Amino acid sequence: MSPALSLFVTGTDTEIGKTLVSAALLRGFVRDGLRAAAMKPIAAGATLVNGVLHNEDADQLDAAANVLLPPDIRTPFMLKEPAAPHIAAAHESVTLDMARIVDAHEAALQMADVVVVEGVGGFRVPLTDSHDTADLAFALNLPVVLVVGMRLGCISHALLTAEAIAARGLRVVGWVANRVDPAMLFPDENIDTLRDRLARQYDAPLLGSVPHLSPASPDVAATHLDTTRLLHALRTAPR
């Protein structure tokens, strides 16, 4: 039996569609006949529903997956305050322990064929006084899918994020253009610029361009993503 595959989804900023793209990847993997599970290791902005803490992003990922992980494995740290993780954690006297997340990820790999791990915010969001999401991705040692929110300034944001990922010794296995701003001028030209530079500098292919969707639909978004190409890259990536 082949070992489970996994990837880390990060973005150029917050609110640029990481959850939509993560859910779309899950739907694509399910369509490809895989047992697909999701992790949102740290979720900020949880609400109590029938005595259980829920986070909208984590719930959306569960809805897209066909393997549901136990809540403490899917989301080891569920924080109530909708704030940066280190601020929310300090407010609740919680220590965000990366070893606990790594252990949860190892457990998740035993339950599915592919595990999509969605980060929180951008790639350098603080988690503790000394660690950030880049350290988490490094600790998990996962190839990274970069979600680029297509809006003014996205070229610099994308290239800076790709540079930060590579600086940690991690591979940008591909990127997704998500058209968060339907009024953006010259979106195709921006995508062409990023397609050229990310491929040339980081060997990172464009996995798809998701149009502005209202309402957001992972199933529709999945039709715009090349999960077959992504799976091939994951299977041939150095371990």
UniProtKB/Swiss-Prot annotation:
One of its GO terms (cellular component) is cytosol. Its cofactor is Mg(2+). Signal peptide: none annotated. GO terms for molecular function: ATP binding; dethiobiotin synthase activity; magnesium ion binding. The active site is at K40. Its EC number is 6.3.3.3. The keyword Ligase applies. It is found in: Cytoplasm. Mg(2+) binds at T19, D57, E118. GO terms for biological process: biotin biosynthetic process. Pathway: Cofactor biosynthesis; biotin biosynthesis; biotin from 7,8-diaminononanoate: step 1/2. ATP binds at residues 15-20, 57, 118-121, 178-179, 211-213. It catalyses: (7R,8S)-7,8-diammoniononanoate + CO2 + ATP = (4R,5S)-dethiobiotin + ADP + phosphate + 3 H(+). InterPro entries: DTB_synth_BioD, P-loop_NTPase. Belongs to the dethiobiotin synthetase family. This is ATP-dependent dethiobiotin synthetase BioD. It comes from Paraburkholderia phymatum (strain DSM 17167 / CIP 108236 / LMG 21445 / STM815).
